């Protein structure tokens, strides 16, 4: 199931606005990531850019630090939601989404290990390098989103 964890605590839609329209109880149920995971639903994250951030690090932070009790997910589930599950949802998991022999080696090198930082510091992790098919793709500081799009478009390469 595709989700957009960027909408959790989305600054353009204050909680009070959503609560006024939906009521507090229903507003809190808009992104029940923990409920989905506990029930075995495979979730993949994405973005409505430019309406929400296209930054997967922000999505992981929002999913792990979900403000509603019981709806936060583990770092492992959040990483899987942003990697393998996305390719599973698009029927491309046999080629991408995990590091295995025979698959494209598309990956990022992060400034810190998401499993070792405090959950509240996940948002501070930076992408240091992007690799497409195992090869470095310029400096990520130049234009990581253009590089990521190029990687997505090279599906059949």
Q: How should these model regions be labeled?
A:
Residues 1-116, 120, 125-133:
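His/Asp/Glu-enriched, well-ordered alpha-helical/loop segment
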Residues 137-152:
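Glycine- and charge-enriched low-complexity intrinsically disordered segments
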């Amino acid at each position: 199931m595709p989700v957009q964890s960027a909408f959790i605590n989305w600054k353009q839609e204050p909680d009070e606005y959503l609560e006024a329209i939906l009521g507090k109880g229903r507003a809190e149920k808009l992104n029940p990531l923990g409920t989905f995971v506990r029930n075995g639903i495979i979730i993949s994250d994405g973005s409505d850019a430019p309406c929400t951030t296209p930054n997967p690090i922000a999505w992981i932070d929002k999913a792990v630090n979900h403000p509603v009790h019981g709806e936060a997910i583990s770092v492992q589930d959040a990483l899987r939601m942003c990697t393998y599950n996305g390719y599973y949802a698009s029927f491309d998991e046999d080629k991408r989404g995990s590091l295995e022999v025979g698959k494209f080696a598309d990956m990022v090198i992060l400034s810190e290990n998401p499993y070792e930082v405090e959950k509240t510091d996940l948002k501070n992790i930076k992408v240091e390098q992007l690799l497409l098919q195992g090869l470095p793709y310029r400096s990520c500081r130049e234009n990581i989103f253009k590089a990521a799009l190029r990687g997505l478009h090279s599906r059949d390469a």
